[in-house]
């Protein structure tokens, strides 16, 4: 059995028009995130983690923000593409752990919906998907409600 670990990190600044999409879920909030795609910072971090585990670079390499094809792109489509690259190499997801770092909005009401989206898109058991949220106790750019950061770690296995 071959095992690979991938880590992903992404940040987006508040300021775009709603909706705010996190983990494939519309989260009610007064502003969205500024981005070339739909700005789903969670799915971007997860995509990077998968690509990293497979030694395939990052989402900027696969979906450059200079390419008009990806303007406003649905990040769920990008995530599924990244996961397909891994499955084409014979790997599947063992587990995923995601940390959303945001002072606002409150994420607790949305965690289960995000887990369901991720389980569907990654063809995984929901019990292999963990999503949690934390604040920075009002410190830094997330604490000042200037944006959201997300970290993701994946464990990929090849039987």
UniProtKB/Swiss-Prot annotation:
Keywords, alphabetical: Isoprene biosynthesis, Lyase, Metal-binding
Pathway: Isoprenoid biosynthesis; isopentenyl diphosphate biosynthesis via DXP pathway; isopentenyl diphosphate from 1-deoxy-D-xylulose 5-phosphate: step 4/6
Top-tier EC class: lyase
Superkingdom of the organism of origin: Bacteria
Cofactor names: a divalent metal cation
Site feature Transition state stabilizer, where: 36, 135
Gene Ontology molecular function: any one: metal ion binding
GO biological process: isopentenyl diphosphate biosynthetic process, methylerythritol 4-phosphate pathway; terpenoid biosynthetic process
InterPro entries the record matches: MECDP_synthase, MECDP_synthase_CS, MECDP_synthase_sf
UniProt catalytic activity: 4-CDP-2-C-methyl-D-erythritol 2-phosphate = 2-C-methyl-D-erythritol 2,4-cyclic diphosphate + CMP
Matching HAMAP family: IspF
Oligomer and partners: Homotrimer.
Family: Belongs to the IspF family.
The name this protein goes by in its record: 2-C-methyl-D-erythritol 2,4-cyclodiphosphate synthase
Annotated gene: ispF
């Amino acid at each position: 059995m071959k095992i690979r670990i991938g880590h992903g990190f992404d940040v987006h600044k508040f300021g775009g028009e709603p909706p705010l999409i996190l983990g494939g879920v519309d989260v009610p909030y007064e502003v969205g995130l500024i981005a070339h795609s739909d700005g789903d910072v969670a799915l971007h971090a997860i995509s990077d983690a998968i690509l990293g585990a497979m030694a395939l670079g990052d989402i900027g390499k696969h979906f450059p923000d200079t390419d008009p094809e990806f303007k406003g792109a649905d990040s769920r489509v990008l995530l599924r593409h990244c996961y397909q690259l891994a499955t084409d190499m014979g790997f599947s997801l063992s587990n995923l752990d995601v940390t959303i770092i945001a002072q606002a909005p409150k994420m607790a009401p949305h965690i289960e919906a995000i887990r369901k989206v991720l389980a569907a898109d990654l063809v995984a058991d929901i019990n292999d998907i963990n999503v949690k949220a934390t604040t920075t106790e009002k410190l830094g750019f997330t604490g000042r409600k200037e944006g959201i950061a997300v970290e993701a770690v994946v464990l990929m296995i090849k039987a």
